[in-house]
Amino acid sequence: MAMSFHRLPQALHMIPRNPTQSSKNLGFSSFLSCAPSMDSRISVSRLSLNHPGSKFGFSLDTRVRNEFIVRAEEGNTEAESEEFVAEIADTEGNVEEVVEAKPTRKPRIKLGDVMGILNQKAIEVAEKVRPVPEIRTGDIVEIKLEVPENKRRLSIYKGIVMSRQNAGIHTTIRIRRIIAGIGVEIVFPIYSPNIKEIKVVSHRKVRRARLYYLRDKLPRLSTFK
């Protein structure tokens, strides 16, 4: 290749110039005859740099070619990126369809929920048979209780409500009264079928939820008319 470049100027000097024939064409033909083993693309590109006005149309610059190649590569990468984004969107849509296709699970009912439902139903049935008034701590109530041994006889208990224990169908109240100077406390389940009637005689406002302090107070604080 080096020898061919040294022969190029000699060939140009040996060939006489003709005014009618352009020396550029002669230089191109002599160069091709002296260097037949060279790559035609490389020779044409280099000759076009030396002779920008060639009639053969080989005036494409290497920089333009590089820019063309880079632009082509950029176009290919953009097309590939668009295809990749489209594939990702398709896969996401398929995943969403699969997720939507799964059947929804029914909520599990725990044992505590079952017991709460049963208690609520039992309370509704008991209130239909015998309505229960609103009882609060400090109220004075009168309870008519049926004696199991003698169902014709009703025992009446009257006292002050010391506390109330909420437990669904097993809700209880504690009543205190003074009998012969001694404090007596009785616990009644308000939804018991043996209780025939519960009547609130009077309401009293108290600050505490449990009046256990009455055990240590004077009996007159636990008495009522």
Swiss-Prot record:
Similarity remark: Belongs to the bacterial ribosomal protein bL19 family.
Any one of the GO BP annotations: translation
GO MF annotation terms: mRNA binding; rRNA binding; structural constituent of ribosome
Function: Located at the 30S-50S ribosomal subunit interface and binds directly to 23S ribosomal RNA.
Organism expressing this protein natively: Arabidopsis thaliana
Cellular component GO terms held in the UniProt record: chloroplast; chloroplast envelope; chloroplast stroma; cytosol; ribonucleoprotein complex; ribosome
Alphabetic keyword roster: Chloroplast, Plastid, Ribonucleoprotein, Ribosomal protein, RNA-binding, rRNA-binding, Transit peptide
Cellular compartments annotated: Plastid, Chloroplast
Annotated PANTHER family: LARGE RIBOSOMAL SUBUNIT PROTEIN BL19CY-RELATED, RIBOSOMAL PROTEIN L19
Transit peptide: 1-70
NCBIfam families according to UniProt: rplS_bact (TIGR01024)
SUPFAM superfamilies named in the record: Translation proteins SH3-like domain
Complexes and interactors: Part of the 50S ribosomal subunit.
Protein name: Large ribosomal subunit protein bL19cz
Family matches, as Pfam families: Ribosomal_L19
Main location: plastid
Record flagged with keyword Protein biosynthesis: no
